[in-house]
């Protein structure tokens, strides 16, 4: 059977072409496009474990890529696909822990407020997915809400709603924008993300160009911003079969002078531990707190002045809240749930061939739309619906360069709760307590 990355010459859609679950369906430099290079040539069954997924993924990639190839244009076998859009996966994971930010504007002490915002920032490593989420189509949008609840009574807090919006603003390269805001607590979050996996021979390196900015408006109209200057990289190494984050970056609040050096440590070949993380929080140049542990279990915080320690984050018991979405029939055609509905249904029925056919149909339609747009205007540039590019930011600015266009009025029409844990593979169990920071 021949399964090639789609070229300019369009091929008919058949059952045999389904194994080419291409993320974009265009020819890519470094991608093997020879006969029998499709997924079905080597993938016959679903791996039972994460290590099994990793081994098969590496074997498939090793046989299909040249060193240095950009993997965003690699045909992705069904075995490695998670039937949920990247926009949905990331935004839902952001949403379920957003309650951590709602208390931050009311914390009077600068250091404790910084730690609370940092605690929310450090929920991002839980966004790791063993399987690849679906690459959003251009103009795809995902929207949801969280109706916050009282931690003690578990009762809904009237008027305490956080609104979430994500949009795919570019397909090549794949760039996604994210925003959420809560008017009651005057908080907002902005992010621009471009994730690019690259095959390096003995490992897969994931370049993570992620810019985030959290904005708080405190009493008296005082505004504070919290942002990262760069981000980590991800690695899947031959024979280790675990996905690791590695690298060091800064998370800062210029208005208060507090900052954190966040260091995801590489595990040595001998000794050490997996997913090791150390964070030094400073006021100016003076270190104040040492946070250490792993980003899959427990982080402990130590006050460097009085040497007292306590739990900062317990990733196993962190409280989460459900996501609320509009019913399927009320969604627009470019909503993530509607775009990938057929793919999700195929996987739910364990019919990966039909899921693949639906995925290919969606991507073929996107390519045809792109051709039509370029035929009408050779200089065509897609204009996002919810995000506006900010040309006033300097080229080296570390903040997201797209501004969210907040709607004039926010409404909650016929929203229904979504079981986020069913959609997000590594969702954290719900618990009724939030680990408290120890001074």
Curated annotation (Swiss-Prot):
Pfam families for this protein: Oxysterol_BP
Residue ranges, compositional bias (Polar residues): 409-419, 429-439
Region named Disordered: 1-40, 409-439
Listed GO CC annotations: cytosol; membrane
Family matches, as InterPro entries: OSBP_sf, Oxysterol-bd, Oxysterol-bd_CS
Stored Gene3D superfamilies: 2.40.160.120, 3.30.70.3490
Record PANTHER family: OXYSTEROL-BINDING PROTEIN 6 (PTHR10972:SF197), OXYSTEROL-BINDING PROTEIN-RELATED (PTHR10972)
Similarity section: Belongs to the OSBP family.
Name of the featured protein: Oxysterol-binding protein 6
């Amino acid at each position: 059977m021949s399964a090639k990355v789609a070229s300019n010459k369009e091929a008919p859609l058949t059952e045999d072409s389904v194994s080419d679950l291409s993320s974009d369906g265009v020819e890519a430099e470094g991608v093997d496009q020879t006969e029998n290079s499709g997924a079905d040539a080597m993938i016959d069954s679903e791996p039972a474990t994460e290590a099994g997924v990793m081994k098969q993924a590496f074997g498939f990639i090793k046989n299909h890529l040249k060193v240095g190839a950009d993997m965003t244009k690699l045909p992705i076998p069904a075995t490695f696909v998670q039937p949920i859009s990247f926009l949905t996966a990331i935004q839902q994971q952001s949403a379920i822990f957003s309650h951590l930010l709602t208390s931050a504007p009311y914390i009077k002490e600068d250091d404790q407020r910084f730690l609370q915002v940092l605690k929310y920032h450090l929920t991002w490593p839980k966004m790791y997915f063993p399987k690849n989420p679906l690459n959003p189509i251009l103009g795809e949008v995902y929207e949801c809400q969280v109706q916050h609840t009282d931690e003690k009574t578990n009762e809904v807090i009237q008027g305490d709603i956080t609104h979430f919006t994500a949009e795919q603003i570019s397909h090549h390269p794949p760039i996604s924008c994210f925003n959420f805001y809560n008017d009651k607590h005057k908080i907002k979050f902005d992010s621009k993300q471009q994730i690019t996996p690259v095959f390096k021979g003995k490992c897969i390196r994931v370049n993570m160009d992620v810019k985030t900015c959290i904005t708080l408006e405190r009493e008296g109209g005082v505004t504070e911003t919290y942002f990262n200057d760069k981000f980590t990289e991800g690695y899947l190494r031959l024979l280790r079969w675990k996905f690791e984050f590695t690298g060091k970056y800064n998370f800062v609040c210029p208005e208060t002078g507090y900052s954190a050096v966040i260091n995801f440590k590489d595990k040595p070949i001998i000794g050490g531990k997996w997913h090791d993380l150390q964070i030094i929080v400073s006021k100016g140049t003076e270190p104040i707190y040492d946070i250490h542990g792993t980003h899959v279990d427990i982080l402990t915080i130590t006050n460097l002045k009085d040497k007292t320690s306590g739990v900062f984050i317990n990733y196993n018991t962190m409280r989460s809240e459900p996501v609320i979405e509009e019913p399927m029939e009320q969604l627009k055609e470019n909503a993530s749930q509607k775009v990938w509905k057929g793919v999700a249904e195929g996987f739910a029925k364990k019919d990966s061939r039909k899921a693949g056919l639906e995925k290919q149909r969606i991507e073929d339609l996107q390519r045809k739309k792109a051709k039509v747009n370029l035929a009408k205007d050779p200089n065509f540039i897609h204009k996002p619906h919810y995000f506006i590019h900010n040309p006033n930011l300097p080229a080296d600015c570390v903040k997201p360069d797209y501004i969210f266009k907040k709607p004039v009025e926010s409404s909650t029409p016929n929203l229904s709760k979504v079981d986020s844990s069913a959609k997000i593979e590594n969702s954290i169990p719900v618990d009724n307590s939030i680990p408290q920071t120890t001074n």
